Amino acid sequence: MPTAPAAQRTPDREQTGGHPAPRGARPARRAWETASALARWPPVRELLVVLVFCLFTSMLTWPYVTRLRDAVVDPGDPYLVTWIMWWDYHQTFRDPLHLFHSNTFYPLKYTLAFSEHCYGLALPFFPLFALGLRPLTVHAVAEFLAFALSGYGAYRLGRTLTGSQGVAWVAGIVFAFVPFRFHLMSQLVYVFSPWLPLVFEALVLFTRSRTRKRAAWLGFAFFMTGLTSVSFFAFALVPLAVCGAVLLTRYGLWRDKEFWRRSAAALSLAALGLVPFMLPYYLVSQLYGFKRSIEEVKANSAWPWHWLSVENRNKLWFGMGETMVGGATFKLFPGLFPLLFTLATLLLVEPLRAPLRVGQTGAHDKRRRLLARLDALIIFAFAVSLLAVGFDRTNYFGGLFGYVTSERALALLTAACVARVCIAYPSFLRAANANFVETLKSPRRCDAFWLGLVLALVGFLYSLGWNFFFYRICYDLLPVFRSMRVPTRGSMFAYLGLALLAGLGVRRLAEVITARRPRIRTPTVYVVACVLLLLEFNGAPLTFMRGDVYPDAVTLRLKETDMRGGIVILPASGDFNHRYMLRSADHAKPLIVGTSGFNSPQEEQIEHWTLNGTIPLSLLGLLEEIPASYVVVKNELIVPERRTNYATFFSRAVASGRLRFVNRFDNHDDLYAVVKTEPDARAEVSPPAELELRDWASMLDEDPFNLLGQYTDWSRALYRLHLVARGRMPRYAEFMQEARALGRGLIPGTEEAQRDFDGRLAALAREWEKHADFREAFGALDDARYVERLYENAGVEADASERAALANALASGAETRAGALLKVAADPRLAERGRHRALLLLHYFAFLRRSPDDPPDHNLEGFNFWLSQLERTDDLDKIALAFRDSIEYKAMKK
């Protein structure tokens, strides 16, 4: 075998000190060179960056990555977003032209537009749905990658702007793991924000080189921003325009035809592509009148001090800002190190080298005249702004300030001031440059600084919402802002700006440190800064829960059932509707109830009728009108005090033949068919025993606990009648006897139940009037003294005219003594004054089944102690818990 030339053997000898390389060294070195070359290949290099951000995400959110099958931070909005992502996938391959006609809020149209459509969020995860992963698993994976991809987007923006890997890593870490992102974890669409930095990167790339390829990338990034989040798209419009103006000024491209022609073409095509995804929001606002009220926007608008309140998932700054007003709601603190690094950017700047100039001393006469007019406009706008703020939207001066609002006057003042400094700085401002345009073009600051400054400022102003005129003028001029409820989400742009400024600050610190201590290398400074940021942003161990990843039996049954209408699931409320939305991704049938950014009128009416009080039979008419095919009742979700109302309603509905009981699943989920819509639906088993109509007396026989809950008002009314008639608290035995007498034949939960109870209570008062003990107590008293005694028993101080009016009514025969007794017992002053005493006594009756001074107490010391506690705290739940945990109650239940 021929010997290799000496020149070719030299590298091997160099590696081994002039001796031949050992066996295996050459293949290892070649493998290393191959791996290094592969790592430099752009796709692999970018993938490695993403993987590093995935590693950081795993560390800062541990153990989230170990529970991707079913991890969610709460059972609210994550379930809603999971359904939206599933629907985007499902409808894309089933009927893409009707993407917005979702299977919720049936029978309304365009219901996907009731909230974010999240199509750009769901699109990258379509393969996971295709592989058969559960919707909640896909959501968990997307949540994890949202951190990593957002960081990667900011990394790219920082690298493109500065050409520095160190700046890029700092910017990526800040943007990926800022505490506010953890605060938004319930709303994945706002956590997933890689397109925000990427659209600004595309703008920078296109500004620097106006090629067709970069124009296409700008249009695509703009399109994906709108495709992912309508809110972020709306928020991006202003900073994109301002950053574009900054870059055009710095690069002198205002008259560059290629820039305008190609950018207009790219953005127009992107906007055209977004029309099918934006038009439904306009149609929804017109069809259903959906619009965010100003009060909603105000309630979600922060104040500057809320930037010192931190998300509680952050382990280092936990609890910071909790005590300030609104601190528990607004969590905007970006972290200490990003602020310190930003200060380094602002303060550690190279000194001015150009000589200072004052004003525009050599300006042309025409420019001086323009400046004089601008100064006059500024003075005028300032004066008008003062008046507009003071008289904002009032009728003074003929309603002038209903048109010249504070935000419009302040916007005019701001525009005039910006125009003034762009032409020339005022003489009292000493600067190296004649005007702001020259300052902007100065090489003293780079593109990254100006873009970071713009983004930080605009994002900060967004967070203030209605508390600052900037957002109000956006609300007036940009219709899309009227559909957004939470202005603080716009603060994400501030964090992107701070990420860039922090990266520049670390670079400047590295320059200063290495200049003073040459032995410290620049990469070391970047590594230390990144480690400090990761330590500050740490959220591990992250608190989360295991979500309902698999469907229950009734959901699987609905999936296999053909139906002509929709499904109503009860109880319907914000606490449960998110879960129903998640399950609708499993059965894929039309759902009438649900939750979203806006809700349907039908859903709100159903929720109103079933949330409190008697469930009216009018609900059946609504179900038939919609039409609903099936009603599912989640019995385990119904609070105990509401179960009788539900049982009564469904008993009457089944008895009337308008609902048909089909079956019970998992021992607690009942399925009913709406007979008018599904006449062929058959009953598979007999209705459960609890659907049998029962009166209040039988419920009290079963458990005295039925004195409380939804029957508390009845029990308190009987208590007050007894107190006024006898001047003392009732004893357990007599009270239960009277309650059973009242409740015999009285069916709770019906629309006529309260009227029936009132009639029975009046009959009881008339019966008492005939009793010997009543006559013995009151028979010898005249009408005036009788009325006075009733008020004395009640403990209510009635004025003389009130007592005289009631006594005169008795004397004239217009009122009976039983009627007077009822009137005093129903006095609102008695109801309020004796509320705590009555409720506490009812707890003794319901839980312990005895009077307060019966054994083992023998006196009222225990009663008086708990009464003082209740009057001090007004915490009835605490009292109920104390009775439930008492040894006496537990022994009784055994």
What do the predicted segments below correspond to?
Residues A39, A236-A271, V349-Q360, V421, ...:
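Perimembrane helix-loop-helix junctions
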Residues F53-F56, A142-L161, Q165-R250, A266-P280, ...:
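Membrane-embedded helix bundles of polyisoprenyl
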Residues F56-S150, V178-S193, N300-T323, W466-Y471, ...:
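Membrane-interface coil-to-helix junctions
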Residues P75-Q91, P276-D365, R369, F391-N395, ...:
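Periplasmic/ER-lumenal interhelical loops and adjacent helix-loop junctions
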Residues H183-Y190, N300-W303, M320-F330, T394-A409, ...:
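Membrane-helix boundary/interfacial segments in multi-pass membrane proteins
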Residues L267-A271, L500, L504-N538:
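Signature aromatic-anchored transmembrane alpha helix within multi-pass, membrane-resident enzymes
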Residues V531-M699:
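Extracytoplasmic
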